[in-house]
Amino acid sequence: MGPGQPASTCVHLAPRTQLDGRSDPKVLQTQNQLQFNRNVPTHSSNLAIRYSCPHAIRIEKLKHSYNESYHCKDADCRVGPDLGSSVSFSVISQERLSYAVHLARRDVKRRQFEKHIKEHHLRSQPQSSQKCGHTKYKIPDHRVERKESKSQAACQCSHQPSKVEISSSGAKVYLYSSHPGQSDLTVPNSPPTHDPGLQPHPRIGDHKNISEQKSLLEVQRLQKELSSCIHKIEEVTKKDRLEEALDPDEERRIRIRRQEQAARSARMLYVLQQQVKEIQEELDKLSPHKIKHTKKSWAMSKLAAAHRGAIRALQMFVTQFTDRGEHPLPARCKELGSLIRQLSLCSVKLDADPSVPDVVIDILQQIEALESLLEKKLSPKKVKKCFSEIRSRFPIGSQKALERWPSTSPKGERRPLTAKDTFPQETSRPSVAKQLLADKYQPDTELPETQRLQSELDVLDADIVLEEGPFILDQSASFKDEVLAVAKTKAGKKKPVTENVPFRKKDTLAPARQQGLRKAERGRQSQPHSKSRVQQTTVSSRLKMNRQPVKDRKAPWIPPNPTSPPASPKCAAWLKVKTSPRDATKEPLQQEDPQEESHLTGAVEHEAARLAWLDAETSKRLKELEELKAKEIDSMQKQRLDWLDAETSRRTKELNELKAEEMYRLQQLSVSATHLADKVEEAVLDRLKPLLVKAQRVNSTTEANIHLKDGSSVNTAKAQPAQEVAAVDFESNNIRQLDDFLEDCASELWAVTHAKILGSETLATVEDSKDSPDLEIMMRRMEEMEKYQESVRQRYNKIAYADPRLWMQEENNDQKISAISEKPLSPHPIRITKTVDRKDPAVNIMLERPCNGNSLDESVGTEEGSEKREAPLLSLAEDSQQKEGRAPLFVPPGMQHSIGDYCSRFEQYLRIISHEAVGSFNPWLIAESFSEELVDEALGAVAAELQDMCEDYAEAVFTSEFLEAAT
């Protein structure tokens, strides 16, 4: 890979022996290893990788003569002393050598044929037509001279000695240097790596739009890739692959590589599917009658990109197939075939080139052949038979489309040529070159096209029969049928033109023969000479057979495809042209076989019917899928609506049940609270009556003693001082005893009252810890109900699917936080203290009950007081008789007044906490009516809000579940 010499890394086996004839054990270990040449200089250019266009065939001569080896030794070409015993040459099969000789002979005969055509054209052209038809023949003469100069230059270049180089192994290498004028024949598929400079613009009469050419080129590339894919699969299935025992690491690597290949192929198929879908949508949007140029070019560029993606997917598929062998392939090959079918149909809809339908038909046939071949790949004996049957079923377009393909791929030239994959594929390509040469230099008015083609093929193939017979005996029939079919269709569309009519580029319509062949010429003008191979041997003999005259001429049948665009105005004009007398005279001269015509027509009709059936079946399946989709969406919407109705009814029923339970609970609470208050009041009064009786008795006893003392004090005012001291002591003792008794009584009364109150509260808490017979408690309960309603509303609005356990935990936490009861507090106990000793013990006691403004009913209080005053007087003697041995207490008037005041206030407190009905004032009726109104209003508002919320929730769920999913 040096700058001035080619890469010459010699790889060979180098066994060595010792002098005694025995093998060296160290050498035996490495004799089967590859020995690389280390004489290559360590230059930076040798480490770089260079890519270039494929070179010509490189042939190295064998070193069998002593002179050559001696010459090489003198020229210092031999690198090492051990290279004399090694034999270094390029191994070329006999088939490739014979094929190269055949191509050289064909090129020589082609040049002879061009000279013959030119001489015949110059002799047959009269002087008058040279003056009148100068414009007509000006361009062909220029082309002839240009081609002649190119052919002469090619001959001179071919006769010049090739460049001789000597490799490091000592062998002579003849390198072929191509002529610079022929560089325009090859158009590689790779993008340009440099600026090509100014290119001559193609003429409008000779070339179509660039986008159409690119689309046609991509379709033909896909066709060629399909054919190569089929050949490779055939080769793989024909070989008997033996399963070798692999290491676990190797098996793991193979498995990982296959998984990566499967993932990559899946991504490629997905991208290709999306591209096909976008192209189909764009084609559906485009009108078949009026299509803007920008939209059409955009669609064609996308179609070409999709074709390139399909080619890459095919190459990956073939790689996986050859890697896996007999392992089962995934089902993506069928999907790839369907995508290629859709791409082909899109190409037919979009392209106006008449050669596209033929290529598409061949692609569809190849896809069917590929699928059937993959289905039977496990039985290699049946593969060849199946494929031959499929090719016999579809004889139209297979070879014809292959011969339209210009071989421009560098990979195809680098691939080694063998008889299996070269000859059957390349045998039908020379027909294009023959037609082009015949139509360029032959006047339109000499002979009918069929006879002209026969004569040209006779001249060209007369000398090739003996040379190429063993290669192509089985390919002549299909070639002959296709050549005649092309001649018939183009002779039928041909418009009569005289010699004197000048040729115009844009204004007039050229003959159908020239324009039809120019369309084919654009797809074939870049075909290299190394790929245009003539291998049909029996064509001339078969074309010389007598043909029956054609009685009627039929226009080619157009398949009734509703989705394909209508024919162009030029094609429509050609179809409507009436037959002229000149055409009538030419009809008896055109000869063809009725059986072959019927066979071709039947095959074309069969293929057109199959395409129409495929379109109808595709539209039918799409319609069925749309109907199924609509039905499924309707059923899903119906199910969702039914579920929403059922859920709404269930929620409403639950709310009604909760409302009824709450009302019943409130009623029970009101009844139980009333009974509880009555019981507490009765129990408190039962415990307080004995204490009140005792207090009244003590009061009455004290008053009697005071009266007696006053009377005795008047009579005995001048008694002894010792008696006064005894009386004072006795009075102080009585006061002390009374204070102790009152303290004990007050403490017992306070304990009993609090025990009753706490017992009532405990009982109410046991029944319902949250409910009490107070109005504020009911208001608090209503607030709790509103909070619960708000939580329900938030739950419906948020649509949060939380855990029910979390809800229960939150409710338990709320229940633990009990509301602070604002009950009226009980009065503090009376603290009775001793009064200050007064000097004058005489006190006027007023036995009257003081008026209390806070009392609810004074009349009731006075009546109760009179009853309490009268009762102790009656039972005072009985109590004194029953309780003998106890000292009576004498209470002063102030203390008695305080005791009475305390009793009245205590009764008022009991009346407040018991909610006793006093006159027309009944607090329980008011509280019950107020609570019922509040509950009714709250429940009505909650029900209305819940109804609105359920409707909003249903609408939101329907929108999110169905409308968004449908769009």
From Swiss-Prot:
Start-end of Pro residues biased regions: 557-568
Composition bias of kind Polar residues appears in 179-188, 525-543
Q: Which domain of life is it from?
A: Eukaryota
- Coiled coil: which residue ranges? 616-642
Q: Does the keyword Iron-sulfur apply?
A: yes
Predominant location of this chain?
A: cytoplasm
Residue ranges for the region (Disordered) are: 178-201, 401-431, 490-601, 849-872
Which molecular function terms from Gene Ontology are attached?
2 iron, 2 sulfur cluster binding; metal ion binding
- Keywords of the record: 2Fe-2S, Ciliopathy, Coiled coil, Cytoplasm, Cytoskeleton, Disease variant, Iron, Iron-sulfur, Joubert syndrome, Metal-binding, Phosphoprotein
The annotated subunit structure for this chain is: Interacts with CEP63. Interacts with WDR62. Forms a complex with OFD1 and CEP20/FOR20. Interacts with PCM1.
This protein is called Protein moonraker
